Design a protein with these regions (language model features):
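A short acidic, Gly/Pro-enriched loop at the edge of an enzyme's catalytic core
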Residues: 157-163
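Conserved SAM-binding strand-loop segment of SAM-dependent methyltransferases
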Residues: 143-156
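Conserved SAM-binding loop of SAM-dependent methyltransferases across substrates and taxa
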Residues: 112-123
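N-terminal juxtadomain amphipathic helix
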Residues: 2-83
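Conserved alpha-helix/loop element of class I SAM-dependent methyltransferases that forms part
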Residues: 85-102
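Conserved SAM-binding motif I beta-strand of class I
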Residues: 125-130
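Conserved class I S-adenosyl-L-methionine
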Residues: 102-111
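Conserved SAM/SAH-binding beta-strand->alpha-helix loop
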Residues: 132-134
Length: 163
């Protein structure tokens, strides 16, 4: 992010129904981004408040953080949790019970490709989309087809998925 980009904006409208009838119901104050606690270092902090829309009752954060700040250098790595990897193995087997003829899987926000690893073990072609530049090499080194970007209509066309 360069000095001219906005780090966050206050959201005054409900993201579900566009109402202005929002009220803060929880204010945790300014917080650093998730997993970015660095002992002794000055860190950027952002408002962490939960709004309730009194028209549709949707809960939402009061401030929208620039996604590049949160996701381009993502600090949580799925593969560091054995419990999560075990769950991914379970989930992939359960999923194939419902889609026994599946040959391809797409993981949106694939992180380091750990969920894709489980599907690859079951002989599926694996595709993923994730904006984390620091995790791209990890996921592609495992043989997954990854687009390092946010998921949208342009990125889906870049994948060249084979069904």
């Amino acid at each position: 992010m360069n000095e001219f980009q906005i780090s966050h904006i206050k959201n005054n409208r409900c993201i579900a129904c566009n109402s202005l009838n929002l009220k803060v119901i929880l204010d945790i104050g300014n917080q650093p981004l998730a997993n970015s606690y660095h002992k002794g270092e000055e860190q950027e902090e952002y408002p962490l408040m939960l709004n309730l829309c009194f028209d549709c009752y949707h809960l939402q954060l009061s401030h929208i953080i620039n996604p590049d700040l949160m996701f381009k250098n993502y600090l949580y790595v799925s593969g560091t949790s054995q419990t999560l990897k075990d769950y991914f193995d379970f989930f992939s087997k359960e999923t194939l019970k419902y889609f026994p003829d599946a040959k391809t899987v797409l993981d949106i926000a694939c992180n380091d490709g750990s969920q894709l690893d489980s599907f690859k073990k079951l002989n599926l072609s694996t595709y993923g989309v994730d904006p984390a530049e620091n995790l791209y090499k990890i996921s592609t080194s495992k043989g997954h087809n990854i687009i390092c970007d946010y998921f949208n209509s342009k990125t889906i066309n870049k994948l060249n998925m084979k069904s």
